[in-house]
């Protein structure tokens, strides 16, 4: 009775190593270079992004740049006040969600991103002043402990009326 080893049964065992590495892959259909797509089959060419989508992305980027300019124009104290107000608004949104009241779901990400941008600019300023990470965290802890809890701007307007 003849025994057959697994190496002999393998389909790659009979193909020399250099030839097996050069075998074409059937899954390869196209290469994307910049905006153009070079395909193996002309009928499978994928259309580039629609012009409307690109235009919308450009508008969003311009708004983001404008918002960053506004944030950079603020003083550090104004930024800290704004962060406290935005965190209060975020808390109110969470309350509305838990109470199943009507709210805009997109406001969550918008506010969180604005808070993150402000804190990033604040940290950039600290780096310019030469404050290291450890001291920055220490100052941040002190700042958080010194925050006076107050209602966010949206509730302040309701109380005055």
Swiss-Prot record:
Residues 1-61 form a transit peptide. Its main location: plastid. The keyword Ribonucleoprotein applies. Disulfide bonds: none annotated. GO terms for molecular function: structural constituent of ribosome. It is found in: Plastid, Chloroplast. Induction: By light. Keywords: Chloroplast, Plastid, Ribonucleoprotein, Ribosomal protein, Transit peptide. GO terms for cellular component: chloroplast; ribonucleoprotein complex; ribosome. CDD domains: Ribosomal_L29_HIP. GO terms for biological process: translation. Transmembrane segments: none annotated. Part of the 50S ribosomal subunit. HAMAP family: Ribosomal_uL29 (MF_00374). PANTHER family: 60S RIBOSOMAL PROTEIN L35/50S RIBOSOMAL PROTEIN L29, LARGE RIBOSOMAL SUBUNIT PROTEIN UL29C. Belongs to the universal ribosomal protein uL29 family. This is Large ribosomal subunit protein uL29c. It comes from Zea mays (Maize).
């Amino acid at each position: 009775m003849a025994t057959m080893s697994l190496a002999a049964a393998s389909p790659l065992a009979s193909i020399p190593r250099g030839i097996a590495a050069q075998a074409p892959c059937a899954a390869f259909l196209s290469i994307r270079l910049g905006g153009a797509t070079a395909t193996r089959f002309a009928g499978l060419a994928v259309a580039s992004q629609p012009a409307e989508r690109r235009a919308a992305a450009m508008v969003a980027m311009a708004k983001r740049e404008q918002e960053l300019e506004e944030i950079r124009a603020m003083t550090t104290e104004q930024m800290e006040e704004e962060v406290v107000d935005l965190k209060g608004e975020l808390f109110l949104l969470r309350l509305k969600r838990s109470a199943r009241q009507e709210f805009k779901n997109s406001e969550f990400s918008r506010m969180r991103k604005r808070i993150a941008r402000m804190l990033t600019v604040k940290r950039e300023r600290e780096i310019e002043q030469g404050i290291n990470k450890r001291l920055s965290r220490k100052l941040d802890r002190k700042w958080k402990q010194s925050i006076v809890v107050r209602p966010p701007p949206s509730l302040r307007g309701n109380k005055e009326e």
